[in-house]
Amino acid sequence: MTKQKTWSDRFEGSLHPAIVEFNASIGFDIELIEYDLTGSIAHAQMLAHTGIISPEEAQKLTQGLEQIRQEYRQGEFKPGIDQEDVHFAVERRLTEIVGDVGKKLHTARSRNDQVGTDIRLYLRDQISQIRAQLREFQQVLVNHAENHIETLIPGYTHLQRAQPISLAHHLLAYFQMAQRDWERLGEIYARTNISPLGCGALAGTTFPIDRHYSAELLQFQGVYGNSLDGVSDRDFAIEFLNAASLIMVHLSRLSEEMILWSSHEFSFISLTDSCATGSSIMPQKKNPDVPELVRGKAGRVFGHLQGMLVLMKGLPLAYNKDLQEDKEAIFDGVKTVKVCLEAMTILLAEGIKFREERLAEAVSEDFSNATDVADYLAAKGIPFREAYNLVGKVVKTSSAAGKLLKDLSLEEWQALHPAFEADIYDAIAPKQVVAARNSYGGTGFEQIRQAITRAKAQLESS
């Protein structure tokens, strides 16, 4: 049996060893130790600032906490499950280092506001890192876009060829998704960057603390105005996991396209040896493991979001032990997004080569220029719906004859409608089809150049 003397001498009995292990979170919340130490240093300095402890005591506490930081970084501080959690582990080690003054650190503080502070410090840091990764990802997309403004690729709806577009246009669509992700995380950062320190267990404290002072030391932008809300709020974590899920949605969609494009059936890209694997039995295989793993890992992040929503939905105010379960969801969500962003950035930068000859063939061997025939007739005064129906018949007739639109003779065109002239061939040429779509945000080459300029400005603004 294990006696948990850290709580209070109210307990005479001891916890069953299995319950000790079940109750302990030190196995995963050790991830917060650097943030716990930083928060504790700020708390100690606030206690001295308000006269609750002496400056000398605060200095001893700060020195002891920094010693623990060094011990942890050097692999010397390895608390076991008997320590229950990172907060008790730090406090016990601190008391060993500085003596009884270490027991004063927890004055005017509860583990409830302490862990809330730690998680916010951690997530604030991780959000900044993920935003930086998104910028690297976006930069690679822009680099490819600059090189492929006039490289054409089939555009799809329903996974059926629809209209030819610029490859750069396709890549910049993912830039825009990542831009929304970057902006969304910035908004979540602001709501995460609020201090619960000083809220106590749930009702505040009788000590004359200065919550704004400790918040300023920790570079929080403000403090919670309600102590119950401060210790029980996990909205910011749910918002983060929602944003993380959207990042994974976007990466998974791109992954699916990389998988399709690398297949023999598409052959739009080839995978380099640095980002592909082989088969244990089929020597000809080159497998797109990176995008497949990213696509698969999206599910675990979605699961963490759902888990957090279910975790929070029935909790009465204020703190409940259920909230111990928030950390692994947050930690794994962070790590999964970061590793997937890194892998996809490497894949795009080093792992793929666009097969431009194959892409050129792909946009020339179908009827994806049919809309432009209808537009051609509409520009000559024929109602679009009438033109649309006529072109549908043209496609049906041409397909039955084994011909593409470009293969029809002028006589055949004019037999269909006298409005057709020799310039129809220019109008349906793939590059002209793409260049003509010059509306704002469209795939026209001039629009793409402007979009790249805007994208670069967004990258430089951060």
From Swiss-Prot:
Pathway this chain belongs to: Amino-acid biosynthesis; L-arginine biosynthesis; L-arginine from L-ornithine and carbamoyl phosphate: step 3/3
SUPFAM superfamilies for this protein: L-aspartase-like (SSF48557)
GO molecular function: argininosuccinate lyase activity
Coiled coil: none
Keywords attached to this entry: Amino-acid biosynthesis, Arginine biosynthesis, Cytoplasm, Lyase
InterPro entries: Arg_succ_lyase_C, Argininosuccinate_lyase, Fumarase/histidase_N, Fumarate_lyase_CS, Fumarate_lyase_fam, Fumarate_lyase_N, L-Aspartase-like
Cytoplasm in keyword set: yes
EC number: 4.3.2.1
Known catalytic reactions: 2-(N(omega)-L-arginino)succinate = fumarate + L-arginine
Domain of life of the native organism: Bacteria
Subcellular location: Cytoplasm
Annotated GO biological process: arginine biosynthetic process via ornithine; L-arginine biosynthetic process
CDD domains named among the record's database cross-references: Argininosuccinate_lyase (cd01359)
Family in the record: Belongs to the lyase 1 family. Argininosuccinate lyase subfamily.
UniProt protein name: Argininosuccinate lyase
Organism annotation: Rippkaea orientalis (strain PCC 8801 / RF-1)
Lineage: Bacteria, Bacillati, Cyanobacteriota, Cyanophyceae, Oscillatoriophycideae
